[in-house]
Swiss-Prot record:
Organism per entry: Lodderomyces elongisporus (strain ATCC 11503 / CBS 2605 / JCM 1781 / NBRC 1676 / NRRL YB-4239)
Entry-linked Pfam families: NAC
CDD domains given in the database record: NAC_BTF3
Binding partners and assembly: Part of the nascent polypeptide-associated complex (NAC), consisting of EGD2 and EGD1. NAC associates with ribosomes via EGD1.
Name this protein carries in UniProt: Nascent polypeptide-associated complex subunit beta
Limits of the NAC-A/B domain: 33-98
Compositionally skewed regions (Low complexity) per UniProt: 130-139
Assigned keywords, A-Z: Cytoplasm, Nucleus, Protein transport, Repressor, Transcription, Transcription regulation, Transport
Recorded name of the encoding gene: EGD1
InterPro entries: BTF3, NAC_A/B_dom_sf, Nas_poly-pep-assoc_cplx_dom
Similarity comment: Belongs to the NAC-beta family.
Entry keyword Nucleus: yes
Predominant location: cytoplasm
Length: 157
């Protein structure tokens, strides 16, 4: 009976390999549903309770960006000093949220507020505010662009 080497190679690859008499198990991918159930189980062990009345949450990052949770679920276990925030975060600039988050800003964000105030006093648009390095880069890029107000392009050259 002739044996086709291609079919034989395909069969050998498809069968589970044995190492030391036991089969090698294929790794299963971790799904987010499994992560969620593990998180829920862990919060249950800590006796975390749902905290009502939280409409939004903001996490301030070092680079001046804010993780903004519009609809947030909060569970807390004060005995274990553990709190879980669940929802879909949006990364926003601090200037996009400035009227709503002024009461939430602490001492660590005073430098960002100071930079914003300087930009407003200088007449710049605060929407352009990002990190301090980004503001300097846009100023340098705008220096090369000539003002063409009430002039023709051919006259400038």
């Amino acid at each position: 009976m002739p044996v086709d080497p291609e079919k034989l190679a395909k069969l050998q690859k498809s069968t589970a390999k044995k190492v030391g008499g036991s089969r090698v198990k294929a790794k299963k991918g971790v799904k987010t549903e499994q992560d969620d159930t593990k998180l829920i189980e862990t919060l249950g062990k800590l006796k975390a309770t749902k905290i009502e009345g939280v409409e939004e949450a903001n996490f301030f990052k070092d680079d001046g960006k804010v993780l903004h949770f519009n609809r947030v679920g909060v569970q807390g276990a004060p005995a274990a000093n553990t709190f879980a925030f669940t929802g879909y975060p949006q990364e926003k600039n601090i200037t996009q949220l400035i009227p709503q988050i002024l009461p939430q800003l602490g001492a660590e964000n005073l430098e960002i507020l100071r930079q914003l105030a300087e930009q407003i006093q200088a007449g710049k648009n605060p929407k352009d505010f990002g990190a301090a390095g980004e503001a300097g880069a846009t100023e340098e890029a705008n220096e090369d662009i000539p003002d063409l107000v009430d002039q023709k392009f051919d006259d400038v050259e």
